[in-house]
């Protein structure tokens, strides 16, 4: 597996091949890699680079991974669950929950695919020890097209993240 990609940083890998294929062994390797980085996540980008018009990624997040609520301007995003359980929480601009999509892999009987076509704040509450998913969005990557929710803590504010996620989990459990 090591010869199939190059590592951009501790969280991002790029495929070296024009045809990207992944198997169970690859996913297990990604799980190991995610467990050794601070934010407990890793992604394999199947697109060639950030300028590609289509971005496809295999992503692994551990349960403790925090995805700050965000939205994408001028982009759509789709997610297909490969392994694990997650609640996708969608918010209005003021941070009120609009919808929760409870997801799992196909065999779970839960929703296993969704697509967002409009800019809406969203985050993940990971319900399993590990979440593996395939995400597709249009490129090229432009950090300015990602808007982080001003009412949600930044990743580095660990205590506020713990409080925010605990409060969010309570709110979701009441829906």
What does each of the following model-derived ranges do?
Residues 58-75, 118:
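Conserved short histidine dyad/triad with adjacent acidic residue
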Residues 1-53, 99-106, 161-175:
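A short, N-terminal "cap"/entry segment at the start of jelly-roll beta-barrel domains
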